Amino acid sequence: MGWKMASPTDDLEASLLSFEKLDRASPDLWPEQLPGVAEFAASFKSPITSSPPKWMAEIERDDIDMLKELGSLTTANLMEKVRGLQNLAYQLGLDESREMTRGKFLNILEKPKK
């Protein structure tokens, strides 16, 4: 038998074929939309060579280390870290609520009367 079954990749490639005919060649069909834009964009310095953004000036070494640590985590480990932070935030909210209630009962939050 000289024939073989078509593989799934052959079917995929066949489904991606386009038989659309363009009227003109690409440069004629898609001329530069706004003349001079390419030169204008090229005139700006690369963001890599320019000075770092303002927000990066405030980042400390510990922050960079934390970003590297978070970047090296797997998806599951990152989700576990996020869950831990959510639980911590919830617990801090409960503690704050408890302390505010305590302060209210002790009348330490009232404004002094004049």
UniProtKB/Swiss-Prot annotation:
State the GO CC annotations. DRM complex
Q: Which UniProt keywords apply?
A: Phosphoprotein
Q: Which Pfam families match?
A: LIN52
Q: Which residues carry this modification: Phosphoserine?
A: S26, S51
Q: Name one GO biological process term.
A: regulation of DNA-templated transcription
Q: Which InterPro entries match?
A: DREAM_LIN52
Q: How does it assemble?
A: Component of the DREAM complex (also named LINC complex) at least composed of E2F4, E2F5, LIN9, LIN37, LIN52, LIN54, MYBL1, MYBL2, RBL1, RBL2, RBBP4, TFDP1 and TFDP2. The complex exists in quiescent cells where it represses cell cycle-dependent genes. It dissociates in S phase when LIN9, LIN37, LIN52 and LIN54 form a subcomplex that binds to MYBL2.
Q: Which family does it belong to?
A: Belongs to the lin-52 family.
The protein here is known as Protein lin-52 homolog
* The organism of origin for this protein: Pongo abelii
Which lineage do the record's taxonomy fields give for this organism? Eukaryota, Metazoa, Chordata, Craniata, Vertebrata
The gene behind this protein is LIN52
